[in-house]
Design a protein with these regions (language model features):
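Gram-negative bacterial Sec-dependent N-terminal signal peptides
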Residues: 2-20
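Divalent metal-binding segments
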Residues: 25-29, 34-36, 40-287, 302, ...
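His/Asp/Glu-enriched, well-ordered alpha-helical/loop segment
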Residues: 39, 229, 344-354, 359-385, ...
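Short loop segments at secondary-structure junctions
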Residues: 54, 175-176, 526-528, 549
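P-loop/Walker A phosphate-binding loop and immediately adjacent motor/lid segment at beta-alpha junctions
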Residues: 121, 534-554
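Flexible, active-site-proximal loop/turn residues at the rims of small-molecule/cofactor binding pockets
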Residues: 137, 252, 414, 528, ...
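Acidic (Asp/Glu)-rich catalytic clusters
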Residues: 263-265, 290-299, 380, 401-403
Length: 554
């Protein structure tokens, strides 16, 4: 283990213990409080009383507060804004934790710049067997071209290098990594995957979707202890953004074991709602174990994650017609219909919610068709099945979400990140059904919002800002990108609270600060309902509380 990693371990361990407090009763007074109620109305309060891990009472301005002598802990909010804790309905906790411990390529503007970061990281961590990283995005580079192994070979030739694209649907390898994996020009593309090649048919070093396994299967798997540390690193970081709960998409058996071992030392710092990975080799065994819920409701397992296609940026999203910028190419369906139905049917028959990744219009149609067939077959209409991303839809499929009782689990910052290339990929007509939040809501669908971290920043205020403005943090473009799809402030807030909770079967516990619900709340540095919408992304969580316990802040 590297010196840098040991330092990170010590720092994270210290962070996890600092600023945590609990009390049997807590009165937080002098706050500018906001929560939604059961009628989805935004209500105000000036003080909140917590008993154990639950909200006991909200107090409006002028209400008599309880005798402070009867309260174990009294805190004065100094008039700052206190709101319901925010929920990210789609992220990847282990990947996020690992990304904090690997070379970070987010923000690079050239292939050479990315390679330089790899060189510096490898030099600082000389004892590593593999150099791993993530975050590159060729769409944002000057060349707008996929990278090649050559640039990595020039900076690290003596160790294998593997770098995941920002969306996790492509990877970039150096020549040694390909040699270890036995990749040659004769290596065939696997089903649902693509090896990018040069004009002579030689692999360039980029592997898309199912082809990534050709390299990744040669990387030594993380041990349970390494996974536990990465999970704790991630959860502690997520708490600093004001996230009190996340839905962890595509979790394998070893990571489930790591979560459960962490519970032996007490509740997790934030809530995690696990989606089991359908491709896990022990998938049927995990389903046979049934649902899981710890005593403190910090770990819940009642859903599965399936991937139907790839991502738009790497042209892996499955489209009905050709990509507008690549004639003859329609993306990748990752599983046969028979295999996908096997995954879905097994989960539905076991009483699990099915959450299927679908980005392209062909993938979304396939998933909705499959849900329509299998929901009727299994009688699982009450399981609130979801489509993760639901990014590009035919108009006729938009109405099917509400009709089938299917939840679109969407990530607002995907729209503001993809706006630079989405029209190039799919053209002016299909874009009308892309990132179509307003059309879906008007058709009766409920949207669970999230970020897809580490693909995007986990900062939920970035997501709230994007939902309301359809702009990036530079407030570009003026007026918003396809602004007719914007959410209202209350709708956006609900998508990160009530509706995200509903999408995980936790609306009776989470999503608002109504009496009887869990005491998950955050104290903010500004009033997100009073400042200009263009400034919402700047908001910061000063404190984060889960189960009435402070997990972030002083």
């Amino acid at each position: 283990m590297t010196t840098r990693l040991w330092a990170a371990i010590l720092a994270a361990s210290a962070f996890a213990c600092v600023g945590v407090s609990s009390a049997d009763t807590l009165l937080y007074k002098n706050v500018n409080g906001y929560t939604l109620n059961g009628d989805r109305e935004l209500i105000r309060f000036s003080a909140i009383k917590i008993e154990d891990d639950r909200v006991a009472q909200l107090y409006s301005e002028g209400d008599s507060l309880p005798d402070e002598a009867s309260i174990d802990s009294v805190r004065d909010g100094g008039g700052k804004t206190l709101t319901t804790g925010l929920i990210d309905a789609h992220g990847h906790v282990l990947s996020y934790g690992q990304s904090l411990l690997r070379v970070d390529l987010v923000g690079t503007t050239t292939e050479a710049g990315a390679a330089e970061r790899v060189r510096a990281f490898a030099a600082d961590n000389a004892e590593l067997e593999w150099v791993l990283g993530r975050g590159w995005n060729q769409v944002l580079w000057d060349s707008n071209e996929f990278p090649t192994a050559r640039s990595l070979d020039a900076v690290v030739a003596d160790k294998p290098v593997w770098l995941s694209r920002v969306d996790g649907h492509a990877g970039w390898a150096n020549s040694l990594a390909m040699e270890i994996a036995g990749i040659t020009r004769d290596t065939a593309d696997p089903d649902g995957g693509q090896i990018l090649r040069d004009a002579n048919g030689n692999p360039t070093g980029v592997f898309v979707d199912n082809a990534m396994a050709l390299i990744r299967n040669n990387i030594p798997p993380a041990t349970i202890e390494e996974q536990k540390f990465a999970l704790m690193t991630a959860m502690n970081s997520l708490a600093t953004y004001g996230l009190t709960s996340v839905h962890d998409a595509g979790v394998g058996s070893s990571t489930v074991a790591a979560y459960k071992e962490l519970l032996e030392d007490g509740p997790l710092p934030i809530r995690v709602n696990v989606m089991l990975a359908a491709t896990d080799q022990f998938y049927t065994e995990r389903l046979a174990e049934g649902h899981f819920r710890d005593a403190d409701d910090t770990l819940t397992i009642n859903s599965v994650k399936i991937a139907a296609d790839g991502a738009l940026g790497s042209r892996g999203a499955a489209m009905i017609d050709d990509y507008s910028d690549m004639a003859g190419h329609r993306g990748l369906i990752l599983h046969s219909e028979e295999r996908m139905h096997y995954f879905m049917r097994a989960a539905m028959n076991a009483g699990f919610q099915v959450n299927t990744h679908a980005i392209g219009d062909a993938a979304n149609k396939l998933v909705l068709d499959s849900y329509e067939l299998l929901i009727a077959e299994t009688g699982s209409s009450d399981r609130r099945h979801r489509v993760e991303h639901a990014q590009i839809l035919r108009y006729e499929d938009i109405v099917r979400f509400a009709e089938l009782g299917v939840i679109p689990s969407m990530q607002a910052t995907h729209a503001t990140s993809d706006k630079n290339m989405a029209v190039d990929r799919i053209g002016d007509v299909r874009i009308q059904g892309a990132y179509a939040w307003r059309k879906l809501m008007d058709a009766g669908a409920l949207i669970a919002n999230g970020s897809d971290f580490p693909v995007e920043s986990p900062n939920p205020f970035f997501g709230l800002h994007a939902s309301i403005t359809r702009q990036d943090k530079d407030n570009d473009p003026v007026g918003g990108w396809y602004p007719e799809e914007r959410m209202t402030d209350e709708e956006a807030f609900a998508s990160f609270t009530l509706d995200a909770a509903y999408s995980g079967f936790q609306e009776d516990l989470l999503g608002s600060l109504e009496p009887g619900k869990k005491a998950d709340f955050i104290l903010l540095d500004r009033d997100i309902f009073a400042i200009p919408d263009t400034e919402i992304w700047q908001a910061k969580a000063l404190e984060t509380w889960v189960n009435g316990v402070r997990v972030h802040g002083d």
